Amino acid sequence: MPKIVVVGAVAGGATCASQIRRLDKESDIIIFEKDRDMSFANCALPYVIGEVVEDRRYALAYTPEKFYDRKQITVKTYHEVIAINDERQTVSVLNRKTNEQFEESYDKLILSPGASANSLGFESDITFTLRNLEDTDAIDQFIKANQVDKVLVVGAGYVSLEVLENLNERGLHPTLIHRSDKINKLMDADMNQPILDELDKREIPYRLNEEINAINGNEITFKSGKVEHYDMIIEGVGTHPNSKFIESSNIKLDRKGFIPVNDKFETNVPNIYAIGDIATSHYRHVDLPASVPLAWGAHRAASIVAEQIAGNDTIEFKGFLGNNIVKFFDYTFASVGVKPNELKQFDYKMVEVTQGAHANYYPGNSPLHLRVYYDTSNRQILRAAAVGKEGADKRIDVLSMAMMNQLTVDELTEFEVAYAPPYSHPKDLINMIGYKAK
């Protein structure tokens, strides 16, 4: 009976194991997870902190016991894989509760260890990061136990923005600082202005080009010379791949510690796959490498690897489009395609439209800003971005499908919109992009 070992039990690992079991009722499947929880919704965590998700149990899909009862898959939490011997096909495992170590053999090994939150490195009792349900519980318990009011949020990526919004919704008083003036880097810089407008509108303090120099109790000294007091600090300063345990193996890592994979999510070592945040692949629509550490990619990779292991070696990954979205108070920011800083590798043109998300005479209308970049050599779409209070998700998802099928910007005129006054225009913003590009 083949033995399949999975490292990591969150989106990629648990999903892959589940999909393998759906296709293969016989193999012995075991998952090692170094932390407390398995199969939780990472994307729900800011909303648990904000009490928008009222019961944290909604963010937890399975316990190891429930997973075994449903799928006959063994999950061992607090078990950390600390080394791989790919020649003997074994992994070394540390039981973090007992400190005991043991070896486990495998026929197939699936690596989905995810990434860990970066830390600013200050020794402080009031600093927290947010990466898993344990972090969420620690933040929530600290807020309740210490009657927290003033919270400093460090960083301005999508997680920090979601955390800040949810702290505000909970009734706390957050302040945002960021070390540069470049916020929400997946979005075009000039399209991020509504973020600052929303902060101003709600009188939420923020400072760009600001950093922490020192923390002394609740007293924070900043690079600017300011000294302020906060009850709590939440750091959202990026992540790094959990690949340290891989370094002693023959598995190839790139300079940042990620694992390059082929279109079957195979590593350079036979019988070893990598999925989720740790894996790097390529874009679907252009010839560039891509790392997209978001939920869709982990789930798609999990399905492909499961099919491969079950014997369907014809299924392959066609690449990322990098579709992403974030809500910040009343606005939605969404984009798809290459990142803004990757556009310089192409000879491109940009076309944009700003108009109501639906018919102007229908109540509740608000402006939607839609922008498309296309390659001048073949007129295929490289990137699209949308910002507005309504309809950004719909337009970006439609453009994602267009890019998936390599449509040109001119063909957007042929997009047949589902039109009624509450939803769109007879000529949608997507159509107008096509007309303006001609």
UniProtKB/Swiss-Prot annotation:
E.C. code: 1.8.1.14
Catalytic residues (UniProt): C43
Superkingdom of the organism of origin: Bacteria
GO molecular function: CoA-disulfide reductase (NADPH) activity; flavin adenine dinucleotide binding; NADP binding; protein disulfide isomerase activity
Enzyme class at the top of the EC tree: oxidoreductase
SUPFAM superfamilies xrefs: FAD/NAD(P)-binding domain, FAD/NAD-linked reductases, dimerisation (C-terminal) domain
Signal peptide: none
Stated pH dependence: Optimum pH is 7.0-8.0.
Result after altering Y419F: Reduces activity by 80%. Loss of activity
Binding annotation for substrate: T15, Q19, R22, S39, N42, K71, H299, K427
Cofactor remark: Binds 1 FAD per subunit.
Binding site for NADP(+): 151-166
Cofactor: FAD
Key words of the record: FAD, Flavoprotein, NADP, Oxidoreductase, Redox-active center
Family matches, as InterPro entries: CoA_disulphide_reductase (IPR017758), CoA_disulphide_reductase_staph (IPR023536), FAD-bd_OxRdtase (IPR050260), FAD/NAD-bd_sf (IPR036188), FAD/NAD-binding_dom (IPR023753), FAD/NAD-linked_Rdtase_dimer_sf (IPR016156), Pyr_nucl-diS_OxRdtase_dimer (IPR004099)
Entry binding sites for FAD: 8-33, 267-277, 419
Family: Belongs to the class-III pyridine nucleotide-disulfide oxidoreductase family.
Subunit architecture: Homodimer.
PANTHER family named in the record: NAD(P)H SULFUR OXIDOREDUCTASE (COA-DEPENDENT), PYRIDINE NUCLEOTIDE-DISULFIDE OXIDOREDUCTASE DOMAIN-CONTAINING
Domain notes: Contains 2 FAD binding domains and a single NADPH binding domain.
Other remarks on this protein: Reduction of disulfides occurs by a thiol-disulfide exchange reaction, but involves only a single catalytic cysteine residue that forms a stable mixed disulfide with CoA during catalysis.
Protein's job: Catalyzes specifically the NADPH-dependent reduction of coenzyme A disulfide. Is also active with other disulfide substrates containing at least one 4'-phosphopantethienyl moiety such as 4,4'-diphosphopantethine, but is not able to reduce oxidized glutathione, cystine, pantethine, or H(2)O(2).
Protein name per its UniProtKB record: Coenzyme A disulfide reductase
